[in-house]
Amino acid sequence: MKRKLLVFATIIVASAGISLGADAAAIWAQNCASCHGKDGSGTTTMGKKLGVKDYSKDQGFSDAEAANVIKNGKGKMKGYKAKLSDADVKALVAYVRSLKK
């Protein structure tokens, strides 16, 4: 019985990890892409107006710094701590890292 429970728990955890990337992409598309662009380049009309960084090239920040900006905002960017869970923020930081070319 314990073995079955362990196998089941492993499957659940693995499944959660698989959906994490899709969730981060959806969070990015819904909350970030209008300024930062789908690819993180910041070449949208709003991104150019605000002078956002090109995250496909410039990633000179730590994961903790990125999480802090996502949660609390910076400059004209609003914070998302009331909207996103810590797991969402962590997934979003990993997603931003994946945008680097």
Show the residue positions of the predicted features.
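Post-cleavage N-terminal segment of exported redox proteins
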Residues: 1-22, 69, 98-101
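Short hydrophobic/aromatic-rich motifs at helix boundaries and adjacent loops
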Residues: 3, 37-39, 61
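Electrostatic cytochrome c docking/interface patches
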Residues: 13-27, 43, 62-65
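A short linear-motif detector with a strong N-terminal bias
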Residues: 14, 32-36, 55-57
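Amphipathic alpha-helical interaction segments
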Residues: 16, 35-36, 63, 88
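Periplasmic/extracellular electron-transfer cofactor-ligation site
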Residues: 25-51, 74-76, 99-101
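Extracytoplasmic electron-transfer domains, predominantly the class I c-type cytochrome c fold
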Residues: 49-101
